[in-house]
């Protein structure tokens, strides 16, 4: 979306984006409204960790990950992504929207999701422009009790920051 708040701050059109993972059965239940799980990361290009097919059984497992000290890491990663897909589409899995926010600024791929003197009102733009638009388009519940935020690395700090700066807009973070 084009952000009015950020465009005014920067003096040119500025945009916020998001990837939205819809729950299984979204189209079959047009009356349903959903809670949001909002992920903070560094400008994700897509939903990593989500794969609709299992890994090739003949996939090479001689690759070594020094970070984890194991062989076959790529196959493990693909298997876990497929396992997540199977869970996500299972009848007993809870239904919610997963949102990955894209909030690049002119200097970096991440605004840190807060208002600042040098980058502008990114926190307010995300909270009061982007999230309501997502909830409108994808039938979010639209209440603070129905939103949860999380992230890894810097995104973890961002999740904590938005929970602190917008305590009535989120029901928790990790």
Give the location of each predicted region.
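Non-catalytic cap/lid and distal C-terminal segments of serine-dependent acyl enzymes
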Residues: 1-174
